[in-house]
C-alpha cells in the first residue's frame, strides 16, 4: 500500500534513492502496459502526486534536520524544501503534517517528529521535577580552583561548581578548547572530597574513552 514506507521506513533506504527507484519502476511499468507487456509492479496510485511520497519527503527533511542538530523545523522552511524536492505532490503538505508521526505547534509554527517531541517532553519533565526538589551543598568551591597544582580555573569555569552546589541539574556547555575538561576534573575532586558518589557517562563509546582519559576515571 505504501512503497515509500516499505523502502524508507522498513528497509532504511534514503528518501531520494527510494524516490528515484520507485518513480523509475512506475515509468517502466506504465511503458510495459502501453506496449502490451506485464508491468513490473502495479501501484495503487500515481506515485509522483501521491500523499505517500509527500509524507516520506517531509519525514526525510525532519530527519535530516535532526542530523544537523535541530529537533524542530519552521513550517515555512519545511514546506519550501518539500516543494523543491517533490513539487508534484507538495499541495498535500498540510495533510501530511497532520500525520500521527508528526507534531505541529501552531504557536511557534514549528514541526517535529512525534518520537523526538515526546522524548524531549519527557526530558523536560524530569529536569523540572529535579529542579523542584533542590538539595543545596555548602562547599568551599575556591578549594578546587587549582587543578593538579598546575591549571587555574577561570571565574567562568569554576561557576559550574557553584551551580552544582545550588541545583540538582546543571548543563556544562562549550565548544572545543573552552575548558570543560578542567571544570569536570574540579567537579570530580569536589565530589570525592565530600564523599559523594558519581558516575561518568557519555553518549558514544568514543566520547566515553576521551572522558576517561581526561579524568583518569571509568566512563561509559
Question: What is each of the regions a protein language model found here?
Answer:
Residues 1-220:
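Conserved ATP-binding/catalytic motifs of P-loop helicase motor domains
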